[in-house]
Amino acid sequence: MDPVCWICKDDYSIEKNYCNCKNEYKVVHDECMKKWIQYSRERSCKLCNKEYNIISVRKPFSQWVFSIKDCKKSAILYATLFLCTFIISLVLTRINITKIIDTSKNDVSFKLVTMIFYLLPFVITCISFITLIVYLYKYCKISAKNNTYDTIYEL
């Protein structure tokens, strides 16, 4: 009787050893083992506790596949907020602040309120930009994980 793969139960003719298991659990196809590790995310055999000889390889960045479903709705919201506040900041900074401050008499409170009014969009833009950078970093980490594949070798 020919040995059978313990994953797919098909006949198996080539002996490859990925762990220290004996008997029927030693026999497994290459493709079945790759799919098993990809599905289970296990790095060692559950029966004999031997670690598999796995090397994780990340695809080159030019071959990465990005998915919008990995991007959270809040990240899209922050990107939109950033663009809106950036545009508002550009429009408001085009107005000559010094002209407004100089035209007011020596009223310090008016100058202070005017400066706060014009600096607020800039501050909001900076905060939303930092938040956007954080979300982009998280998205890149998720994309890097999704664009990594494992290669398993015999012992």
Curated annotation (Swiss-Prot):
Cytoplasmic-side positions: 1-74, 137-155
Organism whose genome encodes this protein: Swinepox virus (strain Kasza) (SWPV)
Superkingdom as given in the UniProt entry: Viruses
GO CC entries: host cell endosome; host cell Golgi apparatus; host cell membrane; membrane
Claim: Transferase is one of the keywords in the record: yes
Function of the molecule: E3 ubiquitin-protein ligase which promotes ubiquitination and subsequent degradation of host MHC-I and CD4 molecules, presumably to prevent lysis of infected cells by cytotoxic T-lymphocytes and NK cell. Binds target molecules through transmembrane interaction. The result of this ubiquitination is the enhancement of the endocytosis of the target chain and the delivery to the lysosome, where it is proteolytically destroyed.
Family stated for the protein in its record: Belongs to the poxviridae LAP protein family.
Segments on the Lumenal face: 96-115
Zn finger limits (RING-CH-type): 1-55
Record keyword S-adenosyl-L-methionine present: no
UniProt-listed InterPro entries: Znf_RING-CH (IPR011016), Znf_RING/FYVE/PHD (IPR013083)
Protein name as catalogued: E3 ubiquitin-protein ligase LAP
Enzyme class: transferase
Membrane topology of the entry: Multi-pass membrane protein
GO biological process: symbiont-mediated perturbation of host ubiquitin-like protein modification; symbiont-mediated suppression of host antigen processing and presentation of peptide antigen via MHC class I
Chain sites annotated for binding Zn(2+) 2: C19, C21, C45, C48
Binding site for Zn(2+) 1: C5, C8, H29, C32
Subcellular location as annotated: Host membrane; Host Golgi apparatus, Host trans-Golgi network membrane; Host early endosome membrane
Keywords: Host endosome, Host Golgi apparatus, Host membrane, Host-virus interaction, Inhibition of host adaptive immune response by virus, Inhibition of host MHC class I molecule presentation by virus, Membrane, Metal-binding, Modulation of host ubiquitin pathway by viral E3 ligase, Modulation of host ubiquitin pathway by virus, Transferase, Transmembrane, Transmembrane helix, Ubl conjugation pathway, Viral immunoevasion, Zinc, Zinc-finger
Domain notes: The RING-CH-type zinc finger domain is required for E3 ligase activity.
EC number from the UniProt entry: 2.3.2.27
UniProt catalytic activity: S-ubiquitinyl-[E2 ubiquitin-conjugating enzyme]-L-cysteine + [acceptor protein]-L-lysine = [E2 ubiquitin-conjugating enzyme]-L-cysteine + N(6)-ubiquitinyl-[acceptor protein]-L-lysine
GO molecular function, one term: zinc ion binding
Protein encoded by which gene: LAP
Principal location: host cell
Transmembrane segments: 75-95, 116-136
